[in-house]
């Protein structure tokens, strides 16, 4: 078999091997309900490091907590309530997102109160210092009172108040924008007659791991944070393995930031993040309490001294919602989704989206995909347009590769002559081949490049489709209602024409009876092979024959958006290669190669025909 076919088999085999490794090391996660993420109980905050602190103690999961009044939250994107017990933000749902494709299904619930499975909420408060004790400051079980009445909404803040009975009056004003950002202004009025010291804190806590934890290797779920430009990601298992810190009374990691940062919990599509005032030093803490199985993220700001008769105020923010790219980017660059006076940008906030190892590819790929979707209005068409752009971007390199492939075809008669002269002397054959390649300026490995280039692009697009919420429940046409999910159709029921249901996703039957899109993928790969005749070697010919159908089943249960990309990529590659080969005097006999693939005993081909890749026999030179 000629070297070009060997290179093609090598490149295809390498692609297959990479996908096999990916498939087995990173198997698709089990289907889960995307409704209610897990939630955590809170614990009392730890005093700032400037003073000796008592260890924090979490509220046990089965603790009996008194019924309290609540303040309703109602915005265009959010609904829920704030508990007067601790002033906890512990009841929050996302109006724009449903658990399933059914518009009548429940909306996604993000936060849940203590007493419900996997409690998950945010809490703010003060840590005492100096002469103050924990009974003098508001904490997890403080009962607050609403000043005035009404629900929390856009441009409708609510104010909570608590008097400690010893001259200190604490006030908390909470506001929310039209997306997912809460602003929390905490004030303390000192009427005690003596100066007091205390430090503000924020807590996001979860009871146990999320019920819908996907535990997928390429997906980060757990604590995510940034401190002075450094991003940290800690999965739940790693949080539970943190070293015991006596001062914290728990397993913990403490990071002191000098200028900016944030910390919280991230799921695949949702996030709850504490954002202290930027430009000021603060401490971020990741903590795990084994006895109560509580995961906790904290921010602690600097110690505040309040003179008698004075009032101190500290402001911070809380993001609780969907990781929408445009929204996150607006908070990062402008501090708000709309021009807002005094809004502080949040450095590095876009990295709360899990861009993965290939972030240098996933970020620009998604940026272009998002823009195309905005322009076209259909994510499937945007993926097709993105494929054309990517192919145009690598066309110069692909062109050189295809030209090299065409030149290799021209060398086949000379290579055959070399083989006859060299006989069984492999060293002589290798030396003469290298001399011929150098003389003709041909790179035999260049044919691998078009396939190898696709590998990082394929995995980057896979990452984008898997983690970005913009692809979640994004429809294409017809039966493809969710491009982030596998093709739901099945050959088992003739793609919905038969009166019986398709196999349940994830079952062996579903693995065998794939959908229409994977079949189109196999056909497109098979058609691409027909630009060249089958290899003469029977074993290599069999590998070529089976490769498209193996890929068809391998990729059949990947996201349909990714399979769509691969199909379009194959068709563009087929067209490019065909045009370039014809421009260099080679006319692929596609129909002849297809016919030969169905023949049990392919007819013997003239030497010139074999050498010219299914084209008309070359004219013999006159002696």
From Swiss-Prot:
Residues 601-623 are annotated as: Disordered. Gene3D superfamilies: 2.70.98.90. GO terms for molecular function: membrane insertase activity. It is a multi-pass membrane protein. The keyword Signal does not apply. Interacts with the Sec translocase complex via SecD. Specifically interacts with transmembrane segments of nascent integral membrane proteins during membrane integration. The keyword Transmembrane helix applies. GO terms for cellular component: plasma membrane. This is Membrane protein insertase YidC. GO terms for biological process: protein insertion into membrane; protein transport. Belongs to the OXA1/ALB3/YidC family. Type 1 subfamily. The chain crosses the membrane at residues 8-28, 379-399, 449-469, 507-527, 543-563. Residues 601-617 have a biased composition (Low complexity). It is found in: Cell inner membrane. Keywords: Cell inner membrane, Cell membrane, Chaperone, Membrane, Protein transport, Transmembrane, Transmembrane helix, Transport. CDD domains: 5TM_YidC_Alb3, EcYidC-like_peri. It comes from the Bacteria. Required for the insertion and/or proper folding and/or complex formation of integral membrane proteins into the membrane. Involved in integration of membrane proteins that insert both dependently and independently of the Sec translocase complex, as well as at least some lipoproteins. Aids folding of multispanning membrane proteins.
